[in-house]
């Protein structure tokens, strides 16, 4: 079930691919002669301080896109770089009578000026093509430092730390891109300190020109090795120089994060050639490296998060790269605890499954010279690619198309008696800090309740070597939990109950297609046959399938809904959370071994008096009112109420989204970070 490469929603168009490739050759050719030796002693031996108590949380932040040229009151057509002309002629949608000052305007007048004249706001402009002003960068990192510096165990940071190249008058340069990345590194270190494991990955706008990156060693890989010297382990330096990917043990001997260079798999990168087996293509070599990493971590009984910039949507990866990534995601399901990506700016999740890879394999066999973007899809969303010319971040019609196709894909999943969880991997795509919609940031929580200082063998998953057959595994989904009449959205109507019964008994159309006989040479390379030949590691007892040590438990998404208020500094607020209310506000928090997913004071309508004993009846009534408002506000940000983020929980959520219209409407709203769009 595929949401093919939806990054086309917001991907930068290569206006003149050949000329950009020519330009790139001056920047990205391998260094001739001997490669200048970097002082690898500057690189950090990246390890978490074992004495630092685990909090069971981590941050995922992506697509910051800081723009030092951003000007408040500038026009959108100038990339938010130039104000309207004094004669009333403007590069933007509307012109002002003159460049009037705004220092003497009150808040309401200033808000009206910006809104009515359709100009760039002080804190950024939601639902626009403009990048992040430094004011937005500053309030973001100030908030992270204040609220999360001592409340997370590590940071996942999935790229794009330079502005888009949308203003021909101020073209980007390699120096500006590197300086922009250095600046964000400095903000990260200021917010979290040098003892915090921070795992960055390279984005398609972190290079010049955007999208295209050749294999290293190159000036780009060497520069990023220096820029990220505080984050890359010294033993990973030589691999990073060649490929710009690495791994970090964020909890030594227990949990690792792998930073992937997805640009080697990205089909907009014209300097690479996919992931052909037994080739020296940089994408293939990265896949080989990734498999070795996963195998090594598995042998050590560790768990792994896979992180990168461009998500593995079928339409944005070279076909053979998509197949190889899906192959590894499923074959190492008991080792990979989750997949985190950015790039898209649209909040969503999707699945890679065996049938999806099977359909992809059928398509690729029709032509050896075409990528999936040129082939008709059997299923899943196919979104229009942006045409040449000005980059358009919005693509709001494309976002709606994505919504429709995700709904179709989720609705075609087989019923609980048919679906096998071992055949599924879940991809999570986070929203961006850049206000394509409202800015978004995620705080995940993961299970540390089974002994914080030593995940003993009784609780932690050690990676059994047993290979279980379909009929032996018995991993059918538990029955769907239907919402009660007093649930978040109320009961289901009669039609929706009929839909549930239908889905319990049957699957989507592509699951009914018989698979080829693996004994025939013509079928030996098909995914379902490959899985029978290669070692495949899955287990119901693994953290990706059962809530145990290191399992992902949920996340809370914060956003900036007040960013369009011009003079008042906006505050990060909870947009939604995947948890149940009782998980966020347990009846006896002092008795829980797992820290709260979100500090209570960050929840909406929090008041400390709620959790103190009233002194008299008058105070008791006031506390009761505050308590009722608090719980109502918390319920409003808990639309999903998932017990955890294991694969089975994601599958159940996908079912419920398509079976309940109000719940899907909420999901569609959250995809756009609760931003009202046309």
From Swiss-Prot:
E.C. numbers: 3.6.1.10
Top EC class of this enzyme: hydrolase
Region (Disordered), start-end ranges: 70-109, 504-547
Residue intervals annotated with topology Cytoplasmic: 1-2
Reaction(s) catalysed by this chain's protein: [phosphate](n+1) + n H2O = (n+1) phosphate + n H(+)
Residues modified by glycosylation: 138, 369, 447, 591, 616
GO cellular component, one term: vacuolar membrane
Biased composition (Basic residues): 529-543
SUPFAM superfamilies (alphabetical): Metallo-dependent phosphatases (SSF56300)
Bilayer disposition of the protein: Single-pass type II membrane protein
Cofactor: a divalent metal cation
Subcellular location per the Swiss-Prot or TrEMBL entry: Vacuole membrane
Annotated transmembrane regions: 3-23
Classification via InterPro entries: ASMase/PPN1_MPP, EndopolyPtase_N1, Metallo-depent_PP-like
The record's account of how the chain is modified after translation: Processing by proteases in the vacuole may be required for activation.
UniProt-recorded Gene Ontology molecular function terms: endopolyphosphatase activity; exopolyphosphatase activity
Sequence similarity: Belongs to the endopolyphosphatase PPN1 family.
PANTHER family according to UniProt: ENDOPOLYPHOSPHATASE, SPHINGOMYELIN PHOSPHODIESTERASE
Protein name per Swiss-Prot or TrEMBL: Endopolyphosphatase
């Amino acid at each position: 079930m595929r949401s093919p490469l939806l990054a086309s929603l917001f991907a930068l168009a290569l206006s003149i691919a050949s000329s950009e490739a020519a330009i790139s050759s001056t920047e990205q050719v391998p260094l001739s002669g001997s490669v200048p030796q970097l002082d690898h002693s500057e690189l950090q031996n990246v390890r978490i301080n074992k004495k630092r108590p685990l909090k069971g949380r981590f941050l995922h932040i992506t697509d910051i896109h800081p723009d030092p040229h951003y000007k408040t009151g500038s026009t959108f057509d100038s990339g938010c770089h130039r104000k309207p002309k004094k004669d009333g002629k403007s590069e933007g949608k509307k012109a002002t009578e003159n460049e009037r000052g705004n220092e003497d305007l009150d808040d309401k007048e200033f808000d009206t000026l910006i809104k009515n004249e359709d100009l760039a706001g002080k804190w950024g402009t939601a639902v626009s093509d403009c990048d992040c002003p430094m004011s937005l960068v500053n309030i973001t990192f100030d908030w992270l430092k204040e609220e999360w510096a001592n409340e997370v165990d590590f940071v996942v940071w999935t790229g794009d730390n330079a502005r888009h190249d949308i203003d021909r008058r101020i073209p980007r340069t390699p120096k500006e891109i590197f300086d922009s990345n250095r600046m964000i590194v400095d903000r990260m270190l200021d917010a979290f300190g040098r003892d915090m494991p921070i795992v960055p990955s390279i984005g398609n706008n972190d290079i010049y020109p955007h999208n295209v990156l050749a294999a290293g060693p190159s000036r780009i890989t060497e520069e990023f090795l220096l820029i990220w010297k505080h984050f890359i382990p010294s033993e990973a330096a030589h691999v990073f120089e060649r490929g710009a990917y690495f791994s970090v043990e964020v909890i030594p001997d227990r949990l690792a994060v792998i930073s992937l260079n997805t640009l080697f798999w990205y089909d907009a990168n014209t300097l690479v050639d996919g992931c052909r087996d037994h080739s020296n293509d940089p994408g293939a070599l990265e896949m080989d490296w990734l498999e070795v990493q996963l195998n090594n971590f598995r042998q050590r009984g560790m768990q792994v998060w896979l992180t990168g910039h461009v998500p593995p949507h079928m339409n944005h990866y070279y076909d053979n790269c998509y197949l190889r990534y899906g192959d590894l995601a499923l074959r190492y399901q008991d080792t990979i605890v989750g997949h985190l990506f950015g790039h898209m700016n649209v909040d969503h999740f999707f699945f890679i499954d065996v049938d999806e890879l099977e359909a992809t394999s059928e398509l690729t066999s029709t032509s050896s010279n075409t990528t999936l973007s040129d082939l008709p899809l059997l299923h899943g969303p196919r979104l229009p690619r942006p045409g040449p010319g000005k980059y358009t971040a919005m693509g709001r019609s494309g976002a709606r198309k994505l919504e429709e196709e995700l709904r179709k894909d989720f609705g075609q999943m087989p019923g609980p008696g048919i679906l096998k969880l071992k055949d599924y991997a879940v991809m999570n795509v986070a929203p961006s800090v850049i206000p394509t919609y409202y800015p978004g940031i995620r705080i995940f929580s993961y299970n540390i309740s089974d002994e914080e200082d030593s995940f003993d063998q009784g609780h932690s998953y050690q990676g059994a070597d047993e290979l279980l057959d379909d009929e032996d595994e018995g991993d059918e989904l538990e029955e769907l939990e239907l919402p009660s009449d007093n649930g978040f959205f109320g009961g289901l109507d009669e039609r929706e109950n009929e839909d549930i019964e239908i889905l319990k008994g049957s699957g989507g159309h592509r699951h009914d297609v018989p698979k080829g006989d693996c004994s025939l040479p013509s079928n030996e390379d098909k995914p379902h046959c490959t899985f029978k030949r290669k070692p495949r590691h899955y287990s119901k007892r693994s953290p990706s399938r059962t809530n145990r040590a290191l399992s992902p438990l949920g996340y809370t998404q914060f956003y900036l809904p007040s960013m369009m208020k011009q003079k008042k500094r906006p505050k990060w607020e909870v947009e939604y959370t995947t948890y149940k209310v009782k998980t966020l506000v347990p009846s006896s928090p002092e008795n829980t071994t797992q820290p709260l997913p979100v500090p209570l004071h960050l929840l909406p309508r929090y008041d400390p008096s709620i959790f103190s004993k009233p002194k008299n009846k008058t105070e008791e009534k006031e506390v009761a009112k505050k308590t009722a408002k608090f719980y109502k506000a918390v319920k409003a940000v808990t639309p999903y109420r998932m017990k955890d983020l294991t694969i089975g929980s994601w599958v159940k959520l996908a079912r419920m989204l398509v079976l309940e219209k109000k719940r899907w409407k909420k999901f569609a709203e959250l995809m756009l970070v609760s931003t009202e769009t046309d």
